[in-house]
Regions:
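Hydrophobic transmembrane alpha-helices and their helix-loop junctions in integral membrane proteins
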Residues: 1-160
Length: 160
């Protein structure tokens, strides 16, 4: 995901990017949860699984690598893509905790990320339509000419 997601978000049309951001990136977490509950059942004591030795370090690496890489991006779509990598790290961290609050937080974050990242890319699609590019430098002062769109971008960004 660290490799293909930024390129997929960057080069895909805005409508496709909205779909990718809202649905396809969460499939890995859904499949993992579905597999666990189908194979083991909901009454299984998940503490016996050793997720904390494998999944927990990988989730933490995804969180930090995605966030640090996002800081240095100048293309807004790539920035959002690396942010999604970090967000998926948060979701995997909830699964790796192997307890009810962790799973509840993961499921809540899946829905929140799907709605808000989709909304972010819809607003970004409006910006791309208006400006023709997605660089951070070109967005300077855009809140004066597109206040509602930039308000949606800020609200969506703060909700994640």
């Amino acid at each position: 995901m660290h490799v293909w997601l930024p390129n997929a978000y960057t080069y895909a049309p805005s409508l496709v990017t909205v779909f990718l951001a809202a649905t396809s990136t969460k499939v890995s977490v859904y499949v993992l949860l579905r597999f666990l509950f189908t194979v083991f059942g909901p009454s299984y004591d998940f503490v016996n699984l050793t997720f904390e030795f494998v999944l927990l370090p990988l989730a933490i690496v995804a969180m930090f690598a995605g966030s640090i890489t996002a800081i240095f991006q100048t293309n807004v779509k790539r920035l959002f893509a690396y942010s999604s990598v970090a967000q998926l790290g948060y979701m995997m961290l909830g699964v790796a905790l192997s307890n009810i609050p962790g799973l509840m937080a993961t499921i809540l974050h899946i829905f929140n990320h799907a709605l808000m990242k989709g909304a972010l890319f819809m607003a970004l699609g409006c910006v791309i339509y208006r400006l023709g590019n997605v660089s951070l430098a070109s967005m300077k002062g855009l809140s004066r000419s597109m206040p509602w769109t930039m308000g949606a971008l800020i609200l969506g960004g703060l909700s994640l």
